[in-house]
Curated annotation (Swiss-Prot):
The chain crosses the membrane at residues 26-46, 54-74, 98-118, 139-159, 170-190, 194-214, 245-265, 282-302, 318-338, 351-371, 390-410, 414-434. This is Multidrug export protein MepA. It is found in: Cell membrane. Belongs to the multi antimicrobial extrusion (MATE) (TC 2.A.66.1) family. MepA subfamily. The lineage of its organism: Bacteria, Bacillati, Bacillota, Bacilli, Bacillales. GO terms for molecular function: antiporter activity; xenobiotic transmembrane transporter activity. Pfam families: MatE.
Length: 452
C-alpha cells in the first residue's frame, strides 16, 4: 500500500482519519437520494402519471440489486481491509478477483432468470393497466444492466476498503453526473420516455464501473482483475459470506419494513402517508450523514482490528461523540423550527401538525439509529458474522410486531411511536451483542494470511 493510505489507516489523528474515510461516504449517501429521484424528476416533465408510477414501483428492484452488490462488496471489502491490516496483499488479490467475477456471474444469472418474466414481476410490484407496460419496459433495461449495476456497487465498496474513499466518491459523482446528462437526451431528444430513463441509469452505472476498473488496473497493488486469482477456498468464502449475507439481508428486510409501515399508514388516509413522507425526507438527510459516518469508518475499524486495537477503540469513541453532536444540533433545530420547516412542504393544517409531530419522534430516534448503524458496521468490520446477521434481521423485522401491538392499542399515534421504539430495541440489542463479544474481538493473524 502507498504511504498516503497507510498514513490514514495507521498514523493520522483519529478525527482526521474519520473525516478522510467518512466525508466522501456522507456525500455519496446524499447523492444516493438525488440518484433515486433523478429519473422521476425528468419523467415528470412529460406529465404522465403512469410513467412516474412505473419508475416509483421499480425502486425496490434497484434496492435489491444494490443488496446483491453488498453481498460481495461489503463481504469482500471488509475482509480485504482486515487482510491489509495483516499486510497480506497476496490474499487480497484472490478475495478481490473472486468477488469481482462472482458479482458479474451473479448479475448474468439474475438477468437470464428475470428477463422473460418482466410482466409478471411488474404485476407483483402492483403495476396494472397502462402502468404495467411502462413498468415492464423499465424492468427489461434494468435487468439487462444487472451485471454492471452489481459490479459498480462492489467496486465502490472496494475503493473504500483499500483506503480510497475519494475515488469511491468520484465514481458515485460520475454516475450521477452522467445520468443527469443522459436522461434529457434519451427521454426528450430521442423520445424514449421510460426506456430512456432506464437506459440513462444503466449506461451511467456501466461507465462509472469502467472508471473503477481503469483506475484500479493502473494504480493499485491490493486488488486484482486477473481471472486466474478467482479461485475460492472454503475459508475465503466463509469470510466473505458471513458478512456479505447479513449486509444483503439488511437492505432487503429494511425495504420490506418500509412497505409494511406504508400499509399501516394507508389505513389512516392520504394525510397520514403525506405527513410521514414529509418527515421521512427531512430526517433522511441527517440520517444519511450519520449512516455515511458509520459506514465510512468500517475499513478503518477493520484494518485496525488486526493491526492496532487501541486505535480501533478510539475510532469508535470519536464516531459516537460525532453522532451525538449531529443529533443534538438536528434535534435543537427541529424543536425550535420544526413547524416552520414542515410548512415549506405543505400548507394543509392537518398535515403540518401531524408531520411536525412525526418529525420530532423520528428525529429523537436519530441518536439510537446512529448507534445501531455504527455497531452493525463494527460487527461487519471485525468479521462477527453471527452478530451482524442478528442485527440485520432485527433492523428489518423488530418494527413489525411493534407496529401490530401499538397500532391495535393506540391507533395512528402508536404507529408513529413504533418507529422510535423499534430503533431503541435495535440500538440496545447492538450494544448487548458488542458487549457480549468484547472478549471475542480478537483475531488470529495466521487464519487471515494463510493462502490455500
Amino acid at each position: 500500500m502507498k504511504d498516503e493510505q497507510l498514513f490514514y489507516f495507521e498514523e493520522s489523528s483519529i478525527f482526521k482519519a474519520m473525516m478522510h474515510f467518512s466525508l466522501p461516504m456522507m456525500i455519496g449517501s446524499l447523492l444516493s437520494v438525488i440518484y433515486g429521484i433523478l429519473n422521476i424528476y425528468f419523467i415528470g416533465f412529460l406529465d404522465n402519471s403512469h410513467m412516474i408510477s412505473a419508475i416509483s414501483l421499480t425502486l425496490p428492484i434497484f434496492a435489491v440489486l444494490m443488496a446483491f452488490g453488498n453481498l460481495f462488496g461489503v463481504g469482500g471489502g471488509t475482509y480485504i481491509s482486515r487482510l491489509l491490516g495483516a499486510k497480506d496483499y497476496i490474499k487480497s488479490h484472490y478475495v478481490s478477483s473472486f468477488s469481482i467475477y462472482s458479482s458479474l456471474v451473479l448479475g448474468l444469472i439474475i438477468a437470464v432468470i428475470t428477463l422473460p418474466f418482466t410482466d409478471q414481476i411488474a404485476s407483483i410490484l402492483c403495476a396494472s393497466g397502462e402502468t404495467l407496460n411502462y413498468t415492464s419496459d423499465y424492468l427489461k433495461i434494468e435487468f439487462l444492466s444487472t451485471p454492471f449495476v452489481i459490479l459498480f456497487f462492489v467496486l465502490e465498496q472496494f475503493a473504500r476498503a483499500i483506503g480510497k474513499p475519494i475515488i469511491s466518491m468520484i465514481g458515485m459523482l460520475s454516475s450521477v453526473g452522467i445520468n443527469i446528462i443522459l436522461d434529457p437526451i434519451l427521454i426528450f431528444g430521442l423520445h424514449l420516455d421510460v426506456v430512456g430513463a432506464a437506459l440513462g441509469t444503466a449506461i451511467s452505472n456501466a461507465i462509472a464501473g469502467l472508471f473503477f476498473i481503469i483506475y484500479f488496473s493502473r494504480k493499485n497493488e491490493t486488488l486484482s482483475f486477473n481471472v486466474k486469482h478467482a479461485k475460492p477456498t472454503k475459508a475465503m468464502m466463509q469470510e466473505i459470506f458471513k458478512i456479505g449475507i447479513p449486509a444483503f439481508l439488511m437492505v432487503v428486510l429494511m425495504g420490506v419494513t418500509g412497505l409494511v409501515v406504508n400499509l399501516f399508514l394507508a389505513t389512516y388516509g392520504n394525510y397520514a402517508i403525506a405527513s410521514y413522507g414529509i418527515s421521512f425526507r427531512l430526517v433522511q438527510f441527517p440520517e444519511l450523514i450519520i449512516m455515511g459516518l458509520s459506514e465510512g469508518v468500517v475499513p478503518l475499524i477493520a484494518y485496525n482490528f488486526v493491526s492496532n486495537k487501541t486505535r480501533m477503540k478510539d475510532t469508535i469513541k470519536v464516531v459516537i461523540v460525532s453522532i451525538a453532536v449531529i443529533f443534538a444540533v438536528c434535534m435543537t433545530v427541529v424543536l425550535v423550527a420544526g413547524h416552520s420547516i414542515v410548512q415549506l412542504f405543505s400548507t394543509d393544517p392537518q398535515i403540518v401538525v401531524l408531520a411536525t409531530f412525526i418529525l420530532k419522534v423520528t428525529m429523537t430516534s436519530l441518536l439510537l439509529n446512529g448507534i445501531g448503524f455504527l455497531f452493525t458496521g463494527m460487527l461487519q468490520a471485525t468479521g462477527q458474522g453471527r452478530g451482524a446477521t442478528i442485527m440485520a434481521i432485527a433492523q428489518g423485522t423488530v418494527i413489525i410486531p411493534v407496529l401490530f401491538v401499538l397500532n391495535s392499542l393506540f391507533g395512528l399515534t402508536g404507529v408513529i411511536w413504533s418507529l422510535l421504539i423499534a430503533e431503541t430495541v435495535c440500538a440496545f440489542l447492538a450494544m448487548f451483542i458488542v458487549y457480549s463479544l468484547r472478549n471475542r474481538l480478537t483475531v488470529d493473524k495466521a487464519s487471515l494470511i494463510e493462502v490455500e
